[in-house]
Amino acid sequence: MLTKRIIPCLDVDNGRVVKGLNFESIKDAGDPVELAAKYSKDGADELVFLDITASQEKRKTIKELVSNVAKVIDIPFTVGGGVNSMDDARNILLSGADKVGVNTGAVKNPELLTELMTIFGKQCVVVAIDAKRNYSEDSTKTMFEENGKKFWFEVFIYGGKQETGLDAIQWAKKATELGAGEVLLTSIDKDGTKDGYDILLTKKIVDTVSVPVIASGGCGKPEDMSEIFVKSDVDAALAASIFHYENQSVNQVKKILRDKNISVRL
């Protein structure tokens, strides 16, 4: 049985780690280099660094900061934000990242995923998908029903600011066929709520693609992780608030998961 990965996330804005609610109302959470070192030491399996305003502000990810983070950790490290070309990806990897997260750049130019896979290998390419419920009925979309309401999951870009009209399930399938070796799936509806991951969305994506999926958005306690692992068979759980603010170390969370018969690396 493959061990499940626990991945702290650093959402970085202007050189500081921040955390929001539903991608809005941002507050400061600390220094990225300090937090990265702490999480690496505390038993994190990987680290995700998202420059959350890079795409929005049309600027490149802060290479120097990425390089400083890479120096203080000894775990795999994914960096996303403002990746729109081969050069953007190459710069991130040369700065010390192991994998590149692509969201807006892949939606705008899906062939970028194939180019990245061809040059750097599938294992380096992570498609980041930010999805949100859209309550309009559309026969061309993957429809769901919950509490008597019908909806589909829409892909958003530019840090959750712009809708795309893309169905998240269909896009995940296409993106992984084009070359993404992993899906970083964030529920905008659940982001920062601390009331659990989006099980419906996560399970559907896990069942649709043949590459590893990371669940993101909504984790408030270790039990939320055990629930998403059991109910969706997702490969990894990403969290921010629980580690930044809740005084839970990664190892403490892993011990709780192990006690619930979730296979984790301790």
Curated annotation (Swiss-Prot):
Protein keywords: Amino-acid biosynthesis, Cytoplasm, Histidine biosynthesis, Lyase
Location relative to the cell: Cytoplasm
Magnesium recorded as keyword: no
GO biological process, one term: L-histidine biosynthetic process
E.C. number(s) listed in UniProt: 4.3.2.10
GO MF entries: imidazoleglycerol-phosphate synthase activity; lyase activity
Catalyses which reaction(s): 5-[(5-phospho-1-deoxy-D-ribulos-1-ylimino)methylamino]-1-(5-phospho-beta-D-ribosyl)imidazole-4-carboxamide + L-glutamine = D-erythro-1-(imidazol-4-yl)glycerol 3-phosphate + 5-amino-1-(5-phospho-beta-D-ribosyl)imidazole-4-carboxamide + L-glutamate + H(+)
Residues annotated as catalytic: D11, D130
Pfam families the record matches: His_biosynth (PF00977)
Pathway: Amino-acid biosynthesis; L-histidine biosynthesis; L-histidine from 5-phospho-alpha-D-ribose 1-diphosphate: step 5/9
Database matches in InterPro entries: Aldolase_TIM, His_biosynth, HisF, IGPS_HisA/HisF, RibuloseP-bd_barrel
Cellular component annotations (GO), alphabetically ordered: cytoplasm
S-adenosyl-L-methionine as UniProt keyword: no
PANTHER family to which the protein is assigned, alphabetical: IMIDAZOLE GLYCEROL PHOSPHATE SYNTHASE HISHF (PTHR21235:SF2), IMIDAZOLE GLYCEROL PHOSPHATE SYNTHASE SUBUNIT HISF/H IGP SYNTHASE SUBUNIT HISF/H (PTHR21235)
UniProt subunit comment: Heterodimer of HisH and HisF.
Function statement: IGPS catalyzes the conversion of PRFAR and glutamine to IGP, AICAR and glutamate. The HisF subunit catalyzes the cyclization activity that produces IGP and AICAR from PRFAR using the ammonia provided by the HisH subunit.
Record-stated family: Belongs to the HisA/HisF family.
Protein name as it appears in the record: Imidazole glycerol phosphate synthase subunit HisF
